[in-house]
Amino acid sequence: MSSSVRLLLIVALLYTNSWAKTVKETLRITWEEGAPNGQARELIYTNGQFPGPPLIWDEGDDVEVTVWNEMAKNVTVHWHGLDQKDSPWSDGTPGLSQRPIQPGQSFVYKFKASPPGNHWYHSHEKMSLVDGLYGAIHIRPKEDRTGLWSQISQDKEDIKAMEKAARDPEYLVVSDWSQYTSEEYWKMSTDSGLLVFCLDSILVNGKGEVYCPGQEFLQKELAPGLVQDAFPPGTEVSDKGCFPADLDQVQGGPWNITKRPDLIPPRVQEGCVASKHENETIVVDPHRNNGWVSMHIVAAATIAQIAFSVDSHEFWLYEIDGNYVNPKKFVSAVMSAGETFSIMMKLDQEPGRYTMRVPNSGASQVLGAFAEMVYEGHERAEKSGRAYLSYGGNPTSPDVEKNSFFPWQLDTDHMSPWPANKPRPGKADEEHLLVLGRVGAPYKYTMNTKYLYPVDFQNNDPLLFYPDATCGTENDGLVLRTKNGSWVDLILQVSTLPGDTSSFEHFMHKHGSKTWRIGFGTGVWNYTSVEEAIQERPQDFNLETPGLRDTWITAFSIGGEAYWSVFRYYVDNPGPWLFHCHIELHLMGGMGIAILDGVDAWPEHIPEEYRLD
């Protein structure tokens, strides 16, 4: 071999290894007492911290994460937003890709770090997300994104600075929090016959407080029009900002069960007890990266819909669910449970301390929360700046509302992918109508009219290894099957089931692939095909610039009006993927379905280490 050829081979090998290094991580999951909001309870720690540590990789890395379960209960870890191409056994979903990790046991997840962007990891065993197993993931892209940043600024120095800032973001894991564990919380609903969803705090990076501003203040903080449109006249929230637990507008029905609100433990719905604790502080340097800072925000909420703003600071939203979007400038944004946002902010205000506001903006509860953004060197400055959001998540002025991102409003939620990426037009190869709602009780949920997805569905015989296990059984109603290389439309109908005509929003997440939302409208879906609906209601569809995400809000039906959404995706990732609501109470109640994508190209060469006995 000539020296020149040898040199070329060495260079090629070095280049390949620079993008395909093996990264090994270890996560030790423990169950310990903590007090993230100043009030003690038991929770999940990851490597001795809560939330778990951010995991930072480069696009294309071969990742190996060993998870040790040192708790007395089962666990799995799902890598939310990662496509798991050619590694469906590492998705972390019990009953689909693996058996749960038993106490004292370990499991090694192996996958490619893909796609680039900001994602997160979390537990997927029952409702244990409520207990604190979650953390941020950042996959740095191979290529720079000059074309993305040039939409924000044409200045070459700004473009370089934004690229650097995006590769080293601040991480904000925003979660809701209750004084009760997930098992205790679920027991409240089954004992009382009511869906209970009152919280104590919202945390930023595991830090927060319990605020008790008083019932009169909270009543004034209700979203304008909410009580008038959705609840009986005179409805009042409690001193925790919660609606009465037994309201028909909240619980639906009538159901053939006995409602026992007296079995809801004290201090869940009312009886606020304040606790002073520590709020998160993010220190930023206006002299670094030409004054640009990027923030990776994870909505690790289990119930709440999180709003976000920083006093006096505008920001550019440039990434949703790990997918780059054509940037738009806002002063506040609302995130649904399960979503990730990445924002770019110019530190161009008077150096000082500014309040970050992260209230619940949904209709479930009036609940505020705060953190701080501090310009480096001004930690002792007085707080300053204009507030864009109130304690209850309401815009503080009409111009704030005009410049805010609301996922339930299609005119503001028009965040098209960058670079351009649109679905195939015309008729899909497959269509599946899924009817979402409650059946039989306020806390029992379905995605296909009647079947409830059990939390232990196929735990012993995961569908990756036994894809035909449900054939010929009633459980097959919990499974959809698609063919590889096909275009699929998922039609979601909400608020049509008996007793569930005032349905709250659902935050629908699909594992294994992102989907385009190509249509949205009110009423009952009574079309023979999506193609027919497009012809009759072209104003309700967008196949040119639809958003592309893995988590979508279905919207909120006020006054009992039915509505539907259409999501389209391409099947190129064979495997068993869960499609479910990311509100933990809804998933625990049955709102999930298994989609076996590419059954005609099912993974056959499963690594020996993942094969079941």
UniProtKB/Swiss-Prot annotation:
Protein family (similarity comment): Belongs to the multicopper oxidase family.
Molecular function via GO: copper ion binding; oxidoreductase activity
Keyword Glycoprotein among UniProt keywords: yes
Key words, A-Z: Copper, Glycoprotein, Metal-binding, Oxidoreductase, Repeat, Signal
Reported function: Laccase; part of the Pks1 gene cluster that mediates the biosynthesis of an anthraquinone derivative pigment that contributes to conidial pigmentation that provides protection from UV radiation, heat and cold stress. The polyketide synthase Pks1 produces 1-acetyl-2,4,6,8-tetrahydroxy-9,10-anthraquinone though condensation of acetyl-CoA with malonyl-CoA. The dehydratase EthD and the laccase Mlac1 further convert the anthraquinone derivative into the final conidial pigment.
Pathways per UniProt: Pigment biosynthesis
Native source organism of the sequence: Metarhizium acridum (strain CQMa 102)
EC class: oxidoreductase
Residue positions binding Cu cation 3: 124, 511, 580
Highest taxon, organism lineage: Eukaryota
Residues the record marks as carrying a glycan: 74, 256, 279, 484, 526
Domain Plastocyanin-like: from-to ranges: 29-142, 171-359, 468-598
Subcellular location: Cell surface
Record's cofactor remark: Binds 4 Cu cations per monomer.
Bilayer-crossing regions: none
Official protein name in the record: Laccase 1
Alphabetical list of SUPFAM superfamilies matching this protein: Cupredoxins
Residues reported to bind Cu cation 2: 80, 122, 582
